[in-house]
From Swiss-Prot:
This is Thymidylate synthase. Homodimer. Pfam families: Thymidylat_synt. It is an enzyme of class 2 (transferase). The lineage of its organism: Bacteria, Bacillati, Bacillota, Bacilli, Bacillales. It catalyses: dUMP + (6R)-5,10-methylene-5,6,7,8-tetrahydrofolate = 7,8-dihydrofolate + dTMP. The active site is at 146 (nucleophile). The keyword Protease does not apply. (6R)-5,10-methylene-5,6,7,8-tetrahydrofolate binds at residues 51, 169, 263. The keyword Transferase applies.
Length: 264
């Protein structure tokens, strides 16, 4: 995927050295955008192998509204373990905000359900937005949302999605985020009777941690391979009804995995 390689090279060539919350140190740029035509293939990075199981199960977990890591652990996904408390709780993170964003009167808003209904009934709306950024609950969250707001757009029978990500760990996180929101776009398009359009990924602080510099150079030395295809194997009518087994990734032929440590 040339778009991702261009981002990595841009950070290495134009970035500034910044300190960060974890103490690792980063090279960073501010403000960057990538666009992926989902008709041309499913945007899974091919210059290193990604753990597809984690991508799918994490998104299903978000959609369920769950905020305890037990479901993830039961399905062999460990990516949230570092932030969970002893009981596995993370506080009101992504799934909570997507499915039960609190109102001042104590009730809540199911943002995802509302947006899907609006796509069906008012597809030209400019309010097809889901936000995970809730200033009143940030201190209760194990980790404030990095990918914090997404907006859908319908044109010519196709559904596009734009994500705003305030903080982007370019080596470990961004490939995962691209695939996750591309998958979400496919899922929402499926339940609303639309084709997929573009996924637009807008980054705020896009950075490479200094303990990932060698890995990024290795990845950039590899030639991208053709993108795989995503196939949804079952007719699903509601976003909550999707299961892991409903997705096939066809033709994914990546280069070997490149290990990198997570900065917590």
């Amino acid at each position: 995927m040339k778009q991702y390689h261009d981002l990595c090279r841009h950070i290495l060539d134009q970035g500034v050295v910044k300190e960060d919350r974890t103490g690792t140190g980063t090279t960073s740029v501010f403000g960057y955008q990538m666009r992926f035509n989902l008709q041309e293939g499913f945007p899974l990075i091919t210059t290193k192998k990604l753990h597809i199981r984690s991508i799918i199960h994490e998104l299903l977990w978000f959609i369920s509204g769950e905020t305890n890591v037990r479901y993830l652990q039961d399905n062999g996904v460990r990516i949230w373990n570092e932030w969970a408390d002893e009981e596995g709780n993370l506080g009101p993170v992504y799934g909570s905000q997507w499915r039960s964003f609190p109102r001042p009167d104590g009730s809540s808003v199911d943002q995802l359900a509302q947006v899907i209904e609006q796509i069906k009934t008012n597809p030209d709306s400019r309010r097809l937005i889901v936000s995970a950024w809730n200033p009143g609950q940030l201190e209760e969250m194990a980790l404030p949302p990095c990918h914090l707001l997404f907006q859908f757009y319908v044109a010519d029978g196709k559904l596009s999605c734009q994500l705003y990500q305030r903080s982007a760990d370019t080596f470990l996180g961004v490939p995962f985020n691209i695939a996750s929101y591309a998958l979400l776009t496919h899922m929402v398009a499926h339940v609303t009777g639309l084709e997929v359009g573009d996924f637009v990924h807008t980054l705020g602080d896009a950075h490479i941690y200094h303990n990932h510099l060698e890995q990024v150079e290795l990845q950039l030395s590899r030639d991208p391979r053709p993108l795989p295809k995503l196939n949804i194997v079952r007719d699903v009518s509601s976003i909550e009804s999707f299961r892991f087994e409903d997705f096939e990734i066809l033709g994914y032929d990546p280069h070997p995995h490149i290990k990198g440590e997570v900065s917590v």
